[in-house]
A protein has these predicted regions:
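RNA-binding accessory domains that recognize and position tRNA/RNA substrates
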Residues: 1-119, 137-183
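Gly/Ser/Thr-rich loops at beta-strand to alpha-helix junctions
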Residues: 77, 129-131
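Short, glycine-rich nucleotide/cofactor-binding loops
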Residues: 122-129
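Flexible loop/turn segments at secondary-structure boundaries
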Residues: 131, 152-155, 187-190
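Hydrophobic positions on the alpha1 helix immediately C-terminal to the Walker A/P-loop
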Residues: 134
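Conserved adenosine/adenylate-binding substructure
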Residues: 181-198
Length: 198
């Protein structure tokens, strides 16, 4: 069976960098072996099993579609349980595509998810129709609006990102919502064209 392995997780302040190794037959689905995420807060005290969540969220669907195994040293139990629901949904939507693969973690850890500095709800927010509809459905919980650079707006498109984040902040000012920006090389980590034709 093919394998995708999270080899390392390195944290420096607000940035997490992951090195991912994969079987030769899976190379066509990856543009690089390094996945990185930068937050607008320091994440150096976040437990390792929680830090693995962003990279696993990227590679697990690839594993399911290619009947591969993802290996990782540590992962958060709450994420693993939520991931099962994501997989079930994808299998119902695409039964021919998602029919194998899995996650093999050395340790699945129950972390204390006690509320800390942030004690509210959050939602991904681009300012598009879907994110506006999500906000309208959940506005009573006053979600923080999280925008991600690296999917629609590339990580190197600084001016375009400033404009996009400006629109998010304008909306947030009208609704008195907090905002957060995340930068991740989502669109340059995986080869989405190859995944779409798989």
């Amino acid at each position: 069976m093919s394998e995708i392995s999270v080899e390392s997780v390195a944290v420096e302040g607000s940035t997490v960098e992951y090195v991912v190794d994969y079987s030769r037959d899976l190379r066509r689905f990856f543009d690089t072996s390094t996945f990185s995420v930068s937050y607008d807060v320091d994440v150096s005290d976040v437990p390792r099993g929680v830090l693995t969540v962003p990279v696993l969220a990227q590679v697990c669907p690839v594993a399911w579609a290619t009947d591969s195994t993802v290996t990782v040293d540590t992962v958060d139990r709450a994420f693993v349980e939520g991931l099962a629901a994501v997989r079930e949904t994808l299998e119902r939507m695409y039964p021919v595509v998602f029919d194998g693969g899995g996650l093999d973690a050395e340790r699945v850890v129950d972390y204390d998810h006690a509320l800390g500095e942030f004690d509210g709800a959050a939602q991904l927010f681009s300012g598009g129709v879907d994110s506006l509809a999500t906000y309208v459905r959940h506005r009573e919980v006053d979600p923080a609006l999280i925008a991600i650079q690296g999917w629609v707006v590339g990580v190197d498109e600084t001016e375009r990102w400033k404009r996009a984040m400006g629109h998010v902040e304008q909306f947030a000012a009208r609704t008195d919502s907090p905002t957060h920006g995340i930068t991740a090389n989502i669109s340059s980590f995986l080869d989405h064209t190859m995944l779409n034709v798989h």
